[in-house]
Amino acid sequence: MRDAFAFGPVCHQPPDRKGTRFPGGTPVYDEDCLYLNVWAPAGAESLPVMVWIHGGTFLTGAGSQPLFDGAALALSGNVVVVSVNYRLGPFGFLHLAPLGDDYSSNVGLLDQIAALEWTRGNIAGFGGDPQRITVFGESAGSMSIAALLAMPAARGLLTGAIMQSGPSQAFRPEQGEAVALGLLAELGIDRANAGKLLELPAEAIMEAAGRLVQRLTGGSPAMIFQPVVDSLTLPEEPVRAVANGSAAGIPLLIGTNAHEGHYFFREGAQVPAIEESLKVLQQALGTPDLSELASHYPANWEGPAGILTDLFFWGGAIAFAESQLEHGPVWMYRFDWGVKEHPLLLRAVHTAEIPYVFGNMSHLRDLGLAISPPMESLSSSMQNAWIAFAHGGRPGTRDLPWPEYGLTERATLIFDETACVVKDPDPEKRRLVFKYIS
């Protein structure tokens, strides 16, 4: 028997100086961090399972963050909710496989697969059905799901996927190797002696990774630690693997928020000049010259915010949805809700949908917001759709019919004060950004 009345340690990551990830206090950070959490209704038996994979740019986060508490979702949906930890940053996403047979890559993704294997083998003891496991995640968690759908080792471990605000993202092998060698250089270790990493304290590796991130990105949204195409673990870029049938038969619910980029580029913050911001986006997105695209956006901080929203998040979600259309049913959503009383949540920014999906409205109260009836209704609508998907592989409900996404009508469920289906929202902008999506 194991005492499981407290959350396990959190994987090493940059400190939470603002207290936004863990507002209740500083968690324990440890390399022994591969724990998961289970919430189940009393008397649960053969209930569908929802496994949450947290985001955080592959650098931060944990399944134990209060925002991801699964109690409300489990009770309202009669489901079993699981949240998982996985190794982050240089500990989870350093592409070391090219250095020899003793080294691995994508171990953060392999941690997620281990959690899914544990869930399949043990969740019946908590009242869950191992034959109905839906993975859902946001940002880097959603990008992780894109990778899982492409990984041979994950096949058979999940029966449905919900991707929130995170498209397919993976380095080419040479990009991942350059980052790995850059970290070794920061630590004064040459390629032939990479095994010395095992002799270093985690804090030293974290500090070197922080210096490398700053040097390579200049503080931009670019992610230097992320999944890498690797012959043993992730043999093909996820969107291409899915287009080739790697996720055949798996229902997919995918979507974005209307103003994702306004989370990263904010009014009043120190934002580079528009030319520098475009360079930052080109680096972060791996796209060619964006100057022509930028001419369609405001020539201030809102321009880069809009491009990041439309090209990376929205365009990426559409591209991934299209890759799965021939192989399984797909549903598309967009979260538009904003709260006038909050300067950041005034718009539907990145992460804004999470408390509504989990039903954790206390998170919004902690931000000083009064919970209005429309907010409660929005949360119920989103929870009911996610729960219906977990139970039966379709998000539509009697109160909220939701047609499948297809190339002809591109039906998209818009979550706002009232939820409604819109056919092909903003088609001109969709065609514009797709010129930049390979």
Where is each model-derived feature located?
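Short glycine-enriched nucleophile-adjacent loop
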Residues: S142-A154
